[in-house]
A protein has these predicted regions:
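Juxtamembrane intracellular "pre-TM" segments in multi-pass secondary transporters
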Residues: 36-64
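C-terminal transmembrane helical hairpin of 12-TM major facilitator-type secondary transporters
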Residues: 123-175
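Helix-to-loop junctions at the C-terminal end of transmembrane segments
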Residues: 111-123, 212
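C-terminal membrane-cytosol helix-exit motif in multi-pass small-molecule transporters
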Residues: 20-40, 238-243
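A membrane-interface helix-boundary motif in multi-pass transporters
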Residues: 3-20, 210-232
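Intrinsic disorder in cytosolic terminal tails and internal cytosolic loops
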Residues: 243-257
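A late C-terminal transmembrane helix in Major Facilitator Superfamily
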Residues: 180-216
Length: 257
């Protein structure tokens, strides 16, 4: 909207200023109106070493980490599909941009449906289904010949990638209830899961950059997409092992519902 009224540079500056003013205003509202309870530090040690060791020894901790890492790698990398569509399939810049923005419309749908599905069949089963959809969708993107007439296959596959990756992301910590984590250990477990699982955000761009520099054009993108697909397969395997290890706990949770 701003770029239609003024030149592109001024439009971008206006957008930045508007976002900055909104954030400053929200910060001031929180500062003046949010009343936080007085913080009282627990006399216990900040890091409980025995609890930390207990969490580290649990296989579920590392399975959950793998599930987070393998699904979040896709969340950090899907935007490479847009330049792939424009460069290989000859899609216009408008179609490429629309394909990118399309993810934000699919996000609430994927999260909404996955939430309801998790209540019916369990969070880890939703993750497993999401990984399957993710893998099939990526294979569709990789195997589709670079012809503009076949761009619709890429768009459909993109919808599958978007829906599955956001569905899986919404279950990252929901599956913790299926493991044998006592309540007092969930915080410690999260302290391990978060930095390791979300380290995909630092690693995925490095791998993408290496692939695109080593193999130019279509081949570079396809090599990277194949790596992402393999990572998703690893996530699915970790998910299936999780399902096997948490079977009794999941049955107990389902009985309570």
């Amino acid at each position: 909207v701003f770029s239609k009224k003024v030149n592109a540079g001024a439009g971008l500056n206006t957008v930045i200023i508007v976002y900055s003013v909104i954030n400053i205003a929200l910060g001031l509202l929180i500062f003046f109106f949010y009343k936080e309870e007085e913080f009282k530090r627990d006399k216990k040690a900040l890091i409980n070493v025995p609890e930390l060791k207990r969490v580290i020894r649990m296989p579920e901790t590392w399975l959950n980490t793998l599930i987070i890492f393998c699904s979040y790698a896709m969340c950090c990398s899907y935007f490479y599909i847009t330049p792939y569509a424009t460069e290989v399939f000859g899609a216009t810049a408008i179609i490429g941009a629309a394909a990118g923005y399309f993810s934000q419309f699919v996000r609430p749908v994927g999260c909404f449906i996955s939430g309801f599905a998790a209540d019916k069949i369990g969070a880890s089963k939703v993750c497993a289904i999401s990984f399957c959809v993710m893998i099939v969708s990526m294979i569709g993107i990789i195997c589709t010949p670079g012809k503009m007439s076949l761009i619709w296959i890429v768009i459909i596959s993109l919808a599958g990638v978007y829906a599955s990756m956001y569905a899986c992301q919404s279950m990252h910590f929901a599956i913790m209830e299926e493991a044998e984590y006592p309540v007092e250990l969930t915080g410690t477990a999260t302290a391990i899961l978060t930095p390791l699982g979300y380290s995909a955000e630092a690693i995925a761009p490095l791998i993408a950059g290496y692939c695109l520099q080593t193999w130019t054009g279509e081949k570079g993108y396809k090599v990277f997409f194949i790596i992402l697909t393999v990572v998703a397969v690893v996530g699915l395997i970790a998910n299936l092992i999780w399902l096997a290890r948490t079977k009794e706990k999941r049955q107990m949770l389902h009985a309570k519902k």
